[in-house]
From Swiss-Prot:
Residues 375-459 form the KH-like domain. GTP 1 binds at residues 9-16, 56-60, 119-122. Residues 3-167, 199-374 form the EngA-type G domain. This is GTPase Der. GTPase that plays an essential role in the late steps of ribosome biogenesis. It comes from the Bacteria. GTP 2 binds at residues 205-212, 252-256, 317-320. GO terms for molecular function: GTP binding. It comes from Chelativorans sp. (strain BNC1). Associates with the 50S ribosomal subunit. Signal peptide: none annotated. NCBIfam families: GTPase_EngA, small_GTP. Belongs to the TRAFAC class TrmE-Era-EngA-EngB-Septin-like GTPase superfamily. EngA (Der) GTPase family.
Length: 470
């Protein structure tokens, strides 16, 4: 039996939009009017490498049993009973409502595993709604935008904990794969980069490296409190801004220290806010102090950003204090590639937030990295490259049998993610995966962002069949 996931919540929080997103096409009717969905609807769904059945439900409402609303509620409760996992959805834009609290209790009484989903986080002013969701006692909320596909990787990870599925078991094709991080376009098979959409940029770094000074310099006003004392910024502050006609949402964050040094309760909350800002962001500018770069905490922050799948850019701040600048920049960029190989080619820009030096170049790097982060490689060129790469450097033999690579497809962007069909994926050495990742970077210009490759076993069409005699 397929793993079943029910999407529930009060009316008009975006359940049907998420249903359509998971199914991969517009099946459920979506409208701003509450109560559009009346019956529960079941369909097979795919989220990256996870396959399951998803159930769309009517909005939970208080109503007498004989009424239409009461019968709709009964359908929803039946869906919860049938499901293996409940996605309890709230509207982060509207904030927590009394009905959310009441229906959270209904779901809790059912005793089913629950993932709390905070929807509509792609608009300004939703951070408070996400934080309010903790009060429901259903665990940490997963922030998503069902309409725009944001947060789908995090949702996949949350579902996978309960589904027990980590590897894709069937052939994934571009036509079947749910669109991640891009709008569903019913008229187009190929998602394209949209330069009119806002870019969410978080500015992170150790305490007192100049994050708030940098944002003030970028927007040209004293919007954020700055000073020589470490830790002035206590929470994640967002600033809406335009640069060369492009809408940008900037997040300043609290300085991120090593865990052992995070003692004060308020500072722990501040670091938690910084982590959430990273997850909300698309591009993350990591501010290094150029006078003492590559501290252990700098590298830990950079590694976290890459693991979260964000698009990193390094700003070497306080460049006005550096002597022998050309030699120093070459040295820092060489160190960047050596110490952060998981995002080889990462863009780094020398700046001075105090004097304004290098700020345009920093924003140019952020926008170009965002384009690469959204890059999609067509299947034809991808597999021609794979054939050439595996011919030039075949996979090794393991236990006397040579491994074979068969086919590759890109299953997501933001960051680029690929599935490689091969024989015996469990035996494929990491060194060969790194070879393929480096080849993808070189051949398709995917420098400076994480690249993820998942392996799946290729199908043997003769498996289980008796060999025919000639």
């Amino acid at each position: 039996m397929p793993f079943k996931v029910a999407i529930v919540g009060r009316p008009n929080v975006g359940k049907s939009t998420l249903f359509n997103r998971l199914v991969g096409r517009r099946i459920a009717l979506v409208d701003d009017t509450p109560g559009v969905t009346r019956d529960r609807r079941v369909h097979s769904a795919r989220l990256l490498d996870l396959r399951f059945d998803v159930i769309d439900t009517a909005g939970l409402e208080e109503a007498a049993a004989p009424t239409l609303a009461g019968r709709m509620r009964a359908q929803t409760e039946t869906a919860i009973d049938e499901a293996d996992l409940v996605l309890f959805m709230i509207d982060a834009r509207a904030g927590l409502m009394p009905d959310d609290r009441a229906f959270a209790e209904v779901v809790r009484r059912k005793g089913k595993p629950v993932v709390l989903v905070a929807n509509k986080t792609d608009v300004r002013g939703t951070d408070a709604g996400v934080l309010e969701a903790f009060a429901l006692g259903l665990g940490d909320p997963v922030a998503v935008s069902a309409e725009h596909g944001q947060g789908m990787v995090e949702l996949r990870d949350a579902i996978a904990e309960f589904a027990g599925q980590a590897e894709e078991e069937e052939r994934v094709t571009e036509e079947e794969t749910v669109l991640i991080g891009e709008d569903i376009d019913p008229d187009s098979e190929e998602a394209r980069y949209d330069p009119t959409k806002p870019i969410r940029i978080a500015v992170v770094g150790r305490p007192n490296v100049g994050k708030s000074t940098l944002i003030n310099a970028l927007i040209g006003e004293e919007r954020l409190l700055t000073g020589p004392e470490a830790g002035i910024t206590r929470d994640s502050i967002s600033v809406d801004w335009h640069w060369r006609g492009r809408e940008i949402k900037l997040f300043d964050t609290a300085g991120m220290r090593r865990k052992a040094r995070v003692q004060e309760k308020l500072e722990k909350l501040s670091v938690g806010e910084s982590l959430r800002a990273i997850r909300f962001a698309e591009v993350v500018i990591i501010v290094f102090d150029a006078t003492m770069p590559f501290e252990k905490q700098d590298l830990q922050i950079a590694d976290l950003i890459v693991r979260e799948g964000r698009a990193p850019v390094i700003a070497f701040n306080k460049w006005d204090l550096i002597e022998n600048r050309q030699e120093k920049l070459a040295e820092l960029r060489e160190k960047t590639d050596r110490l952060l190989p998981q995002a080889r080619g990462l863009r780094s820009v020398p700046i001075s937030a105090e004097t304004g030096r290098g700020l345009d170049q920093l924003l140019e790097a952020a926008v170009s990295t965002h384009v690469v982060w959204n890059r999609r490689v067509p299947t034809g060129p991808l597999n021609r490259w794979l054939e050439a790469a595996s011919t030039q450097h075949p996979p090794p033999a393991v236990s006397g049998r040579r491994l074979k690579v068969k086919y590759m497809t890109q299953v997501k962007t933001r960051p680029p993610g690929f599935v490689l069909s091969c024989s015996r994926p469990e035996a494929m050495p990491q060194s060969y995966i790194r070879y393929l990742v480096n080849g993808l970077r070189e051949s398709f210009d995917i420098f400076g962002v994480p690249i993820r490759i998942s392996l799946r076993a290729s199908e043997n069409p003769y498996a289980g069949k008796a060999r025919k005699r000639t």
